[in-house]
A protein has these predicted regions:
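Positively charged n-region of N-terminal signal peptides that target proteins for export
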Residues: 1-4, 19-20
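C-terminal motif of bacterial Sec signal peptides marking the signal peptidase cleavage site
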Residues: 14-17
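Low-complexity, intrinsically disordered terminal/linker segments enriched in charged
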Residues: 27, 166-181
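A short gly/proline-enriched turn/hairpin at secondary-structure junctions
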Residues: 44-48, 82-92
């Protein structure tokens, strides 16, 4: 009988521990978790988990590209959006981006943006508002036809402000032969 009481006590402890773990995980999701830092050579600022809704904004942004809906891309950007391309080009407005996007899609019938991962973070500055950044890995394919299609890997870092893209940095590298789709 004593062994049965001990067995039930241990089972009750295990079950209650599992319940606490689930509620702990739920609490973690709503709390800021330190995941890194940003350094501007004079100060170090904490980076914490960000707004998951911003990941959906970035998904909608690249879905619009895939649907060749540049008007939707335009509407997901602030008028004064600032984008830094991997080739050194700087885009300084949503209108300029729209015009460049039209030219790009006209020249690249096989353009496709495939998100492979995405994460939202907040940078907590001391003397200015917190910034929400979504960093996304993307496989980008482009070309006039299937024979000329090329693919590159991009990491796109977009600042989301009021539900729209405010600023972005695009980093790119060529794929090795064994990575190509």
């Amino acid at each position: 009988m004593k062994k049965l009481i001990i067995l039930f006590s241990v089972l009750a402890l295990i079950i209650s521990s599992c319940d606490n773990t689930v509620s702990s995980n739920q609490n973690i999701e709503s709390k800021a978790v330190l995941i890194g830092y940003e350094n501007d050579n004079t100060s170090k600022y904490n980076i914490v988990n960000g707004d998951i809704n911003s990941v959906e904004i970035v998904k909608a942004y690249f879905d619009a590209y895939n649907n060749r809906d540049l008007q939707a891309v335009y509407e997901l950007e602030h008028e004064d959006v600032l984008l830094y391309a991997p080739n050194g080009m700087i885009i300084e407005s949503s209108k300029q981006h729209l015009e460049g996007g039209e030219k790009f899609l006209a020249a690249n019938q096989f353009a496709k943006w495939e998100i492979t991962w995405s994460i939202s973070t907040h940078v907590n500055f001391e003397n200015k508002p917190t910034e929400n950044w979504v960093t996304t890995g993307i496989l980008v394919s482009s070309g006039k036809d299937e024979a000329s299609k090329t693919s590159v890997s991009r990491v796109v870092d977009l600042m989301i402000q009021d539900g729209k893209v405010k600023k972005g940095y695009i980093h790119q590298r060529q794929l090795s032969e064994n990575e190509k789709p």
